């Protein structure tokens, strides 16, 4: 097979042509690309933790964390360090190689930056890759997080530029692109994808992938989310997307961003094993592991491992901690055992 060509000049009609291929042809092409670039049976596993929940000022119509919608979600302050580290240790023990931390903010406050940087350093000391999603970042904030050792920063484009105004009005598409530019310039790896099933048209799914594939450098990780409809949000009664259209989105993402990790992200709780298997065949090679994604349900870990065994898949190996790191982690855990610390960080206002 010839080497896969990496392009940053995709036209919308080219991508729409891929979407329109007969399913067998599309899956064959996507799987062929996948096998050239990755071990087709290896899946990178991440754990996602909400480190600050609810009370977000944005108006994303899909999101239960928006302060504008009555979804019954209890807002929480920024979590205490030991609470985060306990979750990170549990994630590593369960096989996750990357720990992702998300905060429901428009953007992080300067007063919280020192704490966030320490959080990155502490999680990395466990021998895990780190990722954060905190909203928009300035160039200086991106540089600070990069200097602290943050490996990945997530900031999704959500949908196409044309449909974007039907989803969110409190930040612009350019705001999102600017944050991605700041992240890339800082030296961190970019995690960016979107959500399908929000009432968009097929051309919007093509438009989302076009925006991602035509960035100066493809995102290192591309999460593709299926909308999880939450009562109280404007999108709670939106029509379901044909699951095969979701598979097509995964497949086209794999073809036009051949070297990126394509993450089968939110919505897996409502997917059959057969649908997930099709997504893995189409090129998905990353998942979030654990019973919750920020505030929405996710398959139980045992269910995922059972599916992996049935499909012959295996997790990507994580970063091995040194003996000194392991000893330091155990010592810290022992020191904290008798403390009755608050679950929240004192300075973290809602």
Curated annotation (Swiss-Prot):
What are its E.C. numbers? 2.8.1.6
* The keyword Ribosomal protein is annotated on this UniProt entry: no
Family the entry assigns: Belongs to the radical SAM superfamily. Biotin synthase family.
> Which top EC class is named for this enzyme in its record?
transferase
Q: Which NCBIfam families match?
A: bioB
Residues annotated as domain Radical SAM core? 41-268
Organism equals Shewanella piezotolerans (strain WP3 / JCM 13877)
Q: Can you cite a GO biological process for this protein? A: biotin biosynthetic process
Keywords assigned: 2Fe-2S, 4Fe-4S, Biotin biosynthesis, Iron, Iron-sulfur, Metal-binding, S-adenosyl-L-methionine, Transferase
- How the protein assembles, per its UniProt entry? Homodimer.
- Residue stretches in coiled coil: none
Alphabetically, the GO molecular function entries are: 2 iron, 2 sulfur cluster binding; 4 iron, 4 sulfur cluster binding; biotin synthase activity; iron ion binding
Q: Which domain of life is it from?
A: Bacteria
Residues binding [2Fe-2S] cluster: 100, 131, 191, 263
The entry marks the following residues as binding [4Fe-4S] cluster, namely 56, 60, 63
What this protein catalyses is: (4R,5S)-dethiobiotin + (sulfur carrier)-SH + 2 reduced [2Fe-2S]-[ferredoxin] + 2 S-adenosyl-L-methionine = (sulfur carrier)-H + biotin + 2 5'-deoxyadenosine + 2 L-methionine + 2 oxidized [2Fe-2S]-[ferredoxin]
Q: In which pathway does it act?
A: Cofactor biosynthesis; biotin biosynthesis; biotin from 7,8-diaminononanoate: step 2/2
- CDD domains according to UniProt: Radical_SAM (cd01335)
Q: Does the keyword Transferase apply?
A: yes
> Which gene underlies this protein?
bioB
| Record function comment | Catalyzes the conversion of dethiobiotin (DTB) to biotin by the insertion of a sulfur atom into dethiobiotin via a radical-based mechanism.
Manner of cofactor binding, per the entry note: Binds 1 [4Fe-4S] cluster. The cluster is coordinated with 3 cysteines and an exchangeable S-adenosyl-L-methionine. Binds 1 [2Fe-2S] cluster. The cluster is coordinated with 3 cysteines and 1 arginine.
The protein depicted here goes by the name Biotin synthase
- InterPro entries assigned to the protein according to its UniProt record, in alphabetical order: Aldolase_TIM, BATS_dom, Biotin_synth/BioAB, Biotin_synthase, Elp3/MiaA/NifB-like_rSAM, rSAM
Q: Give the protein's cofactors.
A: [4Fe-4S] cluster; [2Fe-2S] cluster
């Amino acid at each position: 097979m010839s080497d896969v060509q990496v392009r940053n000049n995709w036209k919308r009609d080219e991508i729409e042509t891929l979407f329109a291929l007969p399913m067998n042809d599309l899956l064959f092409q996507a799987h062929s690309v996948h096998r050239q670039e990755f071990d087709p049976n290896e899946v990178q596993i991440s754990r996602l933790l909400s480190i600050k929940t609810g009370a977000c000022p944005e108006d994303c119509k899909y999101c239960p964390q928006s302060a504008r919608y009555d979804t019954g979600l209890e807002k929480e302050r920024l979590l205490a360090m030991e609470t985060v580290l306990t979750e990170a240790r549990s994630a590593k023990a369960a096989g996750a190689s990357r720990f992702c931390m998300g905060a429901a903010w428009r953007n992080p406050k300067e007063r919280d930056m020192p704490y966030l940087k320490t959080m990155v350093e502490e999680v990395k000391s466990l021998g895990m890759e780190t990722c954060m999603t905190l909203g928009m970042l300035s160039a200086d904030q991106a540089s600070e997080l990069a200097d602290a050792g943050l490996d990945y920063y997530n900031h999704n484009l959500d949908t196409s530029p044309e449909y974007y105004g039907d989803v969110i009005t409190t930040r612009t598409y350019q705001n999102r692109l600017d944050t991605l530019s700041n992240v890339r310039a800082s030296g961190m790896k970019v995690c960016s994808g979107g959500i399908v099933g929000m009432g968009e048209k097929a051309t919007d799914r093509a438009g989302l992938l076009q925006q991602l594939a035509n960035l100066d450098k493809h995102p290192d990780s591309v999460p593709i989310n299926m909308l999880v409809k939450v009562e109280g949000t404007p999108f709670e009664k939106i029509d379901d997307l044909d699951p095969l259209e979701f598979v097509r989105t995964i497949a086209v993402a794999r073809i036009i961003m051949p070297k990126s990790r394509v993450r089968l992200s939110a919505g897996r709780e409502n997917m059959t094993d057969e649908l997930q298997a099709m997504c893995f065949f189409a090129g998905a090679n990353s998942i979030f592991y654990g019973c919750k994604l920020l505030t929405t349900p996710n398959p139980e870990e045992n269910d995922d491992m059972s599916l992996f065994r049935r499909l012959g898949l295996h997790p990507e190996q994580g970063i091995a901690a040194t003996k000194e790191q392991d000893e330091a982690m155990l010592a810290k855990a022992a020191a904290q055992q008798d403390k009755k610390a608050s679950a929240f960080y004192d300075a973290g206002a809602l």
